[in-house]
């Protein structure tokens, strides 16, 4: 026996269609919000990069690295001593690498270029800055430390973007349309 559809069947189906459209619209808004977050993060990095290109940063890079070691716990002294030796005599190269890396991160975040690769570089670079230039956020002594450093937060933001970035408003979408293999780099 075949059952006939009644008017109530149609009335029940209509809200489901509405809910699906609402979910799609909500997901699109979420993806656009994530893209705006990525772009705003890129603007923050562009300010940071501009500061790294200043002559004072370039000239004082070695002193900046040496200054971080002051007041750190003894068990970390080897870590900072290694970096002082590495940077010693090579400060202009490291200052240039720092400025270039931050400029790349700013550009790539704003444009949405090679997103997965950029986020991986950002995570690693943030951890590097946190452990060397920020001294793991220390020294951790009562009355002297008020936070754990900014670069660790930058790494967490890069990690979050790595996990949820949807690719809206990005140059990667244009490149991937012409070069499908680009999706491996862009996400």
Give residue ranges: language-model regions:
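Extended, low-polarity transmembrane helix blocks
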Residues: 2-104, 111-187
């Amino acid at each position: 026996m075949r059952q006939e559809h009644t008017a109530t069947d149609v009335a029940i189906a209509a809200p489901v269609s509405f809910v699906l459209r609402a979910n799609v619209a909500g997901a699109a808004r979420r993806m656009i919000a994530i893209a705006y977050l990525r772009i705003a993060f890129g603007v923050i990095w562009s300010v940071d990069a501009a500061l790294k290109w200043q002559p004072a940063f370039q000239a004082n890079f070695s002193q900046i690295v040496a200054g971080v070691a002051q007041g750190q716990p003894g068990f970390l002294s080897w870590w900072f001593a290694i970096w002082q030796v590495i940077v010693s005599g090579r400060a202009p190269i490291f200052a240039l690498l720092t400025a270039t890396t931050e400029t790349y991160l700013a550009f790539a975040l704003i444009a949405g270029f090679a997103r997965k690769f950029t986020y991986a570089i950002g995570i690693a670079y943030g951890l590097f800055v946190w452990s060397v230039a920020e001294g793991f956020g220390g020294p951790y002594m009562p009355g002297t430390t008020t936070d754990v450093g900014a670069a660790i937060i930058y790494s967490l933001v890069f990690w979050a973007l790595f996990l949820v970035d949807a690719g809206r408003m990005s140059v990667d979408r244009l490149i991937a349309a012409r070069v499908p293999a680009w999706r491996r780099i862009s996400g």
